[in-house]
Amino acid sequence: MQNRTGILILTGVIAAICIYFLSFTFVSRSIKADAEAYATNKQGQFDRAKEQRYLDSLWKEPVFLGSTLQEVTERELGLGLDLQGGMHVVLEVSPADILRSLSGNNRDPKFNEALKQAGEDQKTSNTSFVDLFANNFKKLAPDTKLATIFATSANRSKINFQSSDTEVRKLLNDEVNGAFGRAFQIIQARVDKFGVANPNIQRLPGSGRIQIELPGVDNPERIRRLLTGSAKLEFTEVYRLNELAPAIEGMGSYLLREETARKATAKASTPATGTTAQGNSLESQLAQGSKKDSTSKSDTAAASAQGTALTQLFLPVGQDQLGVYLKDTARANAVLNAPEVRSLFPADAVFAWDRKTFKATDGKEILPLYFLKKPGGRAPLEGDVITDATNDYDDRGRPEVTMNMNAEGARKWKSLTAANVGRPVAILLDNLVYTAPNVQNEIPNGRSSISGNFTVEETKDMSNVLKAGKLPAPTTIVEESVVGATLGSEAVSAGVLSSVVGILLVFGFVVFYYNRAGVIADIALLVNLFFLLGVMASLGAVLTMPGIAGIVLSIGMAVDANVLIFERIKEELELGKTFKQAVSDGFKNALPSIIDSNVTTFLTGIVLFIFGTGLILGFATTLIIGILTSLFAAIFITRLLLEYYIRNGKTLTFSSTWAKKLFADSDFDFVSRRKLYYTISSVIIGAGIISVLFRGFGLGVDFKGGRSYVVRFEKAITTDDVRNSLEGVLGASPEVKTYGGTGIGANQVKVTTSYLVDDNSAGADKRAEATIYKGLSSLKGNPAHIESSQKVGPTIAYDILTSALWSILLAVAVVFVYILIRFKKLAFGYGAVVAMFHDVLIILAIFSIFNGLLPFSLDVDQAFVGALLTIMGYSMNDTVVVFDRIREYLNENRGKKESIPTIINNALNSTLSRTAVTGFSTILVLLVLFIFGGETIRGFSFAMLIGVIVGTYSSLFVATPIVVDALSNDQEKDNGTPTTIEKKTGFDAIPADFTSAEATTPEEFTAKKEKKAKTPLIRPSQS
């Protein structure tokens, strides 16, 4: 073996790097185990806060090779959300709000209608929002230039009223893209300060979206606030209620007229004494500012009626704010925004809600309402003047946020506080009043604080977002997935079990089949596994459940390289060559097939990596790394081990006694029965098409949009009971499937619904979850808990579906081009592509036909698409190995009196042993994954299991016959002139009896040969 020393050095270097990076994982796990033990008392009770204190104490301390615990944690092989719990979020920066801001909040009805229509169109289009808006605006206002909307004073340095629509579009696209970049930086800063170990934040190219993965978080609502709050900080004056007395009295008149018009008979009870902060009636507060002095009975009665109508909705909770029962806030918003009511208030008056409710003495929750003074619609002081913000404690020991301002901010703050001594100044964050303290004296130093009824976490988050800065536009969550820690730990157990069992079975089978040589293969496979994990750790990759599936599958497929090598060595030994020469020639002959087969799977993995997100990205990562490490292990490690035997004068046996004659002298006729195989495949595909037309697929939530919840009950539950309990509260029947069980005695279900899927408001997720709990509460005596949740908006569902289709088409195109380049003949490309489409259609048919009939989910989702692409890669792996052997046999028999069908049949029989061993070992692994891998990948592993069986079938009974037919259709012979079939195959001569008058078809030729005693072209030693 040449360069043996160099390969040994390279292997040692790679091993040292892997040990170095994996050591961080072991140290991190050890410290976390110590923290868990420290936080668990003798009774077995676990204190999470105590564990966190232990970890925090070491966070900045050196714990390993000079690295702090924080650095060790960042370098460990991280676990994905599905294995340790956490939250996956995809944020979308609102382009509509950016355009509104650029227009100066233009109220043109056609402009706003175009924005609205663009939002609807974006749900089913890949066109940019700006182009959709511009097209809609052109339809609504064909004679109006975009410049009339966007040529504001703020934009005059870039465009003017004479600017063309093209110039305005360019500005809008630049601003939207710039806002996306700024939003990404701000979100990244917020997440980095949040303190999550190994967060993953990345842009999703071409989509204007940001993907965030936060392992281990257990407070989704806090994360939602952190990510979606725009951090718009404002300081503004507050109107006293007596200063707005005429307007509020007029609002009472409006409510009275509205009540009379509706002829409402039911009246809400007046709040009980003690529900207000002041104890004074609203009427008495307003009277302080009223100039009227009429005391006539009719006026008094009218005023009383107005006051009653007013206090039924708006309650007095202080001299600076009203209050509204939490359940009545929607109606209050409608009243305050009514044009008739809005006209009663000063032009600079705006209303804003407090961030928190308080409980009245009657137990009901009241939300305070403030009337703020914003001349020109803008606050006199905004958050862009803040230079620093820290969470601290006030003089009463309460958590607060202290802020420092720049020079301009300090000057404005001094002026604002000086003008409002003895009056309140409100501090708002994202249009919610956080505090409105009375100013005691002017504040000259640019310092201010936000204090109130806050927790330490709230002040920490508040200071975080203020320091990170204001988002250029609001963000909305278009996709969300929350995995509970319990579900994650179960996935870890299932993943470890399936991995260990699968790998042990493969190791055992290899030794059982190849005898002592199998031990060498197993050592190479172990090295492959070690390198794979080490490379993943060095790249900062995250291990997910599909990632574990990818590792186990790569081990199964890595067997193929060793099988190809061993089969070739066996052939050379049986030709009488020495062990040393047989090893050398065996590696040389096996290498083309190994490279070709792995390149096709590698290309499929690249497509998955480009188009995949979340769990599929994890699978693609491990698949790509696994292919590279398995190639290195098979080509170099196996060779080094065999060279060790050669140097010590030892030999090896490459087959067990029972396996030696298993495929010896096999003479199966693959070609002549090809029409039967075509018919079998056509029937299955036809049945699948009928099923798709009448039954369709069970689409996953990531393809159809909606909300999905995994719910665990204390006791066994039926899907019908869950469906019936939720139908009333959700307004429609949800989809309910058993999750993680066989349906009998199962206590987990997966609920999918479209409830509030289009609602991107701050409280939509919480309301949806509360509605689910409300419905499930009717199942008396069987408490339920939501273990995980997922939300996918309609826009992102469309994008996911589109990218999935493109990924499949791209994979087909890439593999076709590679086959064409490698084999230089269209016939082989046709066979490979037809076989790929055959495999995909068969899997689709099975998933449609058996959907709802099997005791596990057959949803078509992103994981399913990943399985399809992997199946295509595996099928190509198998097909290319077969094609390589066919090409070799055709070259060996060039110009001989043998037909193409006979040559191809012999080639297929010679590789039958390799096909069977590789297929069986891979199926063995997938069967273990299917049984023990857990619900997360059950549908995925089922698709893979069926796919490997179908892929093995198609390489022998579809791809190869297609090649034969493609060549047979051009049977020509012209007295020494190269025929079309010769041109297609690149051979010098066509076998005479393939085109003779005696046997004009492959079937006739085969029948003729069966009547004769023939010497097969296949070597007796081949198996």
Predicted region positions:
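Pore- and gate-forming transmembrane helices of large, multi-pass membrane proteins
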Residues: 187, 486-506, 525, 557, ...
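Juxtamembrane "pre-transmembrane" interface segments
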Residues: 213, 445-449, 457-501, 766-817
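Small-residue-enriched core segments of transmembrane alpha-helices in multipass membrane transport
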Residues: 12-15, 519-540, 551-558, 615, ...
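Hydrophobic alpha-helical transmembrane segments of membrane transport and translocation systems
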Residues: 8, 527, 534-535, 571-592, ...
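Cytosolic juxtamembrane regions of multi-pass inner-membrane proteins
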Residues: 556-600, 643-651, 855-917, 965-977
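Non-transmembrane, solvent-exposed regions of membrane trafficking/translocation machinery
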Residues: 22-31, 53-64, 71-430, 434-437, ...
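Interfacial segments of transmembrane alpha-helices in multi-pass membrane proteins
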Residues: 3-4, 401-402, 406-421, 425-426, ...
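Transmembrane helices with small-residue packing motifs
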Residues: 15-55, 69-81, 92-102, 664-715
